[in-house]
Regions:
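Acidic helix N-cap motif at the loop->helix transition within catalytic regions
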Residues: 62, 89-97, 145
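Cell-envelope/extracellular polymer assembly enzymes that use nucleotide-activated donors
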Residues: 46-49, 79, 230
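Short, acidic, metal-binding catalytic loop of nucleotide-sugar glycosyltransferases
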Residues: 66-77
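Long helical/loop segments within the catalytic core of UDP-sugar-dependent glycosyltransferases
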Residues: 104, 111-126, 144-224, 262, ...
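Short beta-strand-to-loop acidic/aromatic patch adjacent to the donor-nucleotide binding site
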Residues: 127-141
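A conserved acidic beta->alpha catalytic loop
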Residues: 84-92, 107-109, 141
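N-terminal membrane-anchoring/stem segments of glycan-assembly enzymes
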Residues: 1-44
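Active-site beta-to-alpha loop of glycosyltransferases that engages the nucleotide-sugar donor
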Residues: 52-66, 86
């Protein structure tokens, strides 16, 4: 019995050591790899459709739309659409006041994944013209160079991209400070390490970019609570690599504490 316990502990230690080495390998590669700067191409021709899934987001949506309106990219090449999914507030009114197209959904299965799948089908039926789809949550602020960074990576053949997700309020509470640290570690060390190794990243729900060909071929086929990871696995099974783009940045407002964060993550 003692021998079996000893063997079990040894195997656990070996497994933990392997996992630790794997993570340290990611970190070393991420730190040592050179970050390529944006190409700063003068001629922009890529048409972007920015899709904002929203469920009772009247409070945060105005700031999101305001940040998107200031992005440095030709305005005639950007179309913004908000999915007002089963909202009991003024999300739809706020979306239209902010200059966005509003797609109102009042029935059907719940969940962010179902809302996005429905919206993509509606926009396709309407004949909305776009070369790439960007998904941004309704409580996020967009970096000025978000679309330029996505466009430069698209030009290099990266058809699916995950941008750098950080917080807009990293120093507000001890909880947000912890989340900010984990965000940096996840972005720079984990995703950055995978990128340096030539491996695929994982989608994170916001700050995502899909080429039109990927949208046409795969649509949105993930409907679980973790729809971003589910869709990531679906893409990987179809040999589609997810490129981590650290220059394409969005900033989400994090909840002040764990209880609020739990409600926020399950708000759909």
């Amino acid at each position: 019995m003692v021998l079996m316990l000893g063997t079990g502990c040894f195997l656990v230690l070996v497994l933990l050591s392997i996992m630790s080495l794997y993570q340290w390998g990611h970190a070393i590669l991420a730190i040592s790899s050179k970050k390529s700067a944006s190409n700063q191409r003068s001629a922009r021709t890529t048409r972007f459709l920015i899709l904002i899934p929203a469920h009772n987001e009247e409070d945060g949506l105005p700031e999101t739309l305001k940040s998107l309106s200031t992005i440095q990219y030709p305005k005639d090449l950007v179309h913004i659409a908000v999915i007002a999914d089963r909202c009991a507030d003024d999300t739809a009114k706020v979306a239209r006041a902010g200059g966005a197209q509003c797609l109102e959904r009042s029935e059907g299965p719940g969940g962010k994944g179902a809302a996005m799948s429905w919206a993509m089908q509606v926009l396709r039926n309407e004949g909305t013209l776009f070369d790439a789809l960007v998904i941004v949550d309704a409580d996020c602020l967009a970096d000025l160079h978000l679309l330029e960074a996505f466009d430069d990576a698209l030009a290099k053949g990266h058809e699916v991209q995950q941008g750098y997700n950080y917080l807009s309020n990293p120093w507000e509470t001890p909880f947000t400070r912890v989340i900010a640290v984990t965000s940096v570690l996840r972005n720079f060390l984990f995703y950055g390490g995978k990128e340096a190794m030539g491996c695929s990243a994982m989608l994170s729900g916001t700050g995502m970019c899909l080429s039109r060909s990927v949208v046409d071929q795969h649509g949105w086929s993930a409907f679980s609570v973790a729809e971003d990871w589910e869709f990531s696995v679906s893409l990987l099974l179809n040999d589609v690599i997810i490129h981590f783009n650290p220059l394409a940045r969005v900033y989400a407002r994090e909840s002040k504490g764990l209880k609020q964060a739990s409600r926020q993550r399950l708000r759909w």
